Amino acid sequence: MSEYILEMRNITKEFPGVKALDNVNFKVKRGEIHALVGENGAGKSTLMKILSGVYPYGTYKGDIIIDGEVKQFRNIKDSEKSGIAIIYQELTLVKYMTVGENIFLGEEPVKGGIIDWMKVYSETYRLLKELQINVNPYTKVMNLGIGHQQMVEIAKALSKKARILILDEPTSALTESETEHLLNILKDLKKNGVTCIYISHKLNEVFEIADSITVLRDGKTIMTDKKENFTENKVISLMVGRELTQRFPRAKHTPGEVVFEVKNYTVYDHEIPGKKIIDNVSFKARRGEILGIAGLMGAGRTELAASIFGAFKGRKEGEIYLNGKKIEINTPSDAIKHGIAYLSEDRKRFGLVTLMDVQENIALPNYDRLSKFSIINNNAKIKHAEKYVKELKIKTPTIRQRVANLSGGNQQKVVIAKWLMSDPKVLILDEPTRGIDVGAKFEIYNLMNKLVDMGVCVIMISSELPEILGMSDRILVIHEGKINGEFPIEEADQEKIMYCATGGK
């Protein structure tokens, strides 16, 4: 028996006008965790869609070999029969169905011509217990957090006797503890002989869990080797095709006068009216600085930002000042009129209309300035879109391209472009580089520095401590809805931030 459970040889895949994969070779050893890394657009997802049968045999060139046998998958069912299961970044569970119904959807056991529900739920219980997932099989998926939904997806894959498990950015929306649980599950699966292909931009996770690493760039295999023969910097330079001397381009900022101030601000849960999510928070942000806001998931950072922007349903109390003048914000329109912009942590749900093109998305919050007597100036709309595509280096064949077809990094740049066009005085960035490759991250960091130099007050919320420490001039730490620490960057380190984030005084 070959030591390689999977070989993909000379895989080439073309779309109209684009060669997505160019003679790619990819080999995975039996029972290993193999990380597949590369910038967005490098070809990782395309390669996995070929392996999982989404792109059927005949639409690509090359061979897929499993256990020494050439396979010609014509659909997803074919690949599942060979023991391949893929878990996408955007989960595919049916939220109105129970955990058990989701796990066996389309594969329900039958007894006497009807679905054997007793077996569905007993098997679900067994799978969840094996994975140490504390979830009731009868619970509807809509009542589970993202972390538990991710575990249910894994249980679903294992119910189909998956031998090769593909995970695409599995931790992008997980908390630190959920991420740790997931990585431990994958380590246990490895001990039980399951082979994992792990796609992630989070190199710390890659180096914790992977046995081998393959780097793709521009649709080509650049390097495959044991993890021990890589460093993070080496992986990054192979991914982007150039050496990044520093991951965080820290600029010398000179903080000026206070531009934005929040006083005695309290935000209440919109479903539990008496529950405080943010409790009597006060802070100031200055012109010419990046104010970082750190804290654990669930601390209330996103609710604070969304409430300031007028986009959170819960009741609020307190005062907001802009350039020393008290302002009232009840809706996002109010915030935009005052020059406050908010880039949400979930760009696809709250930042973009993905079925619209680049031009329309950039224009969306700016129709007041693009219109006269309620007539839209289409020439101005085109001119502004082309300007920001050029300035932000948005990779798109045309401003008429649907945003859904852009990479994550370029989608994020479109969101930034629409807010830049609104000429903000204050820009709140919530997880600005989530799900974005290292090259695009570097470009967004440079853009943040440029905005600060232009006099924009930048507030950055991030769950990545290296990002907070690498880009902030000053850091606030939120714990359970309260500010539990404040540090100038010269005095900040990971230990101090985590101490405050976990409730230390």
Curated annotation (Swiss-Prot):
CDD domains: ABC_Carb_Monos_I (cd03216), ABC_Carb_Monos_II (cd03215). GO terms for cellular component: plasma membrane. SUPFAM superfamilies: P-loop containing nucleoside triphosphate hydrolases. It catalyses: D-xylose(out) + ATP + H2O = D-xylose(in) + ADP + phosphate + H(+). The keyword Repeat applies. It comes from the Bacteria. Residues 6-243, 262-505 form the ABC transporter domain. It is an enzyme of class 7 (translocase). The keyword S-adenosyl-L-methionine does not apply. It is found in: Cell membrane. Part of the ABC transporter complex XylFGH involved in xylose import. Responsible for energy coupling to the transport system. Belongs to the ABC transporter superfamily. Xylose importer (TC 3.A.1.2.4) family. The complex is composed of two ATP-binding proteins (XylG), two transmembrane proteins (XylH) and a solute-binding protein (XylF). This is Xylose import ATP-binding protein XylG. It comes from Thermoanaerobacter pseudethanolicus (strain ATCC 33223 / 39E) (Clostridium thermohydrosulfuricum). The gene is xylG.
